[in-house]
């Protein structure tokens, strides 16, 4: 996001709130760790995590014993400070997914979870993730794509926040144009549904 995060944005990216909200326990984290482990058995891989939340992806990869060279990015200094304090062994950088300061094919895997819903739209971010990925892109949604598309920009006195639901048709068409294979997993955690796309880059 090109805008400076508003106070509302900072509150809604609060690390403790994410844990209370149950996002840390979502089965998508374990699914992603298992698939990455299967794709790179016994080998190290480099991974860029876009929108790090509470650092849960890094923790899941570490707890699974995967030798991942991890870099996490987020637009929120508050989130990054919390991640640095809790996980000093990883790299945490302030950066927007729509303007990644890395060269083409820098990372074996590029991952994002519950990030694209919070952007004004997804295409720039998706193309940037594919640009810097060498082999795989993983995209997870808590706001599962379905028609009709709903682009929700919630205005407040303190700024705004997006919570979009995308039409799966155009979104998945973009993924297939950029990928030679797209694997989809639909998961459930209590009442919450999530969807993960695991893309193998062309």
Provide a role label for each language-model segment.
Residues 54-99:
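Class I SAM-dependent methyltransferase SAM/SAH-binding core
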Residues 114-118:
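Short catalytic micro-motifs in class I SAM-dependent methyltransferases
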Residues 111:
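A conserved beta-strand element that flanks and buttresses the S-adenosyl-L-methionine
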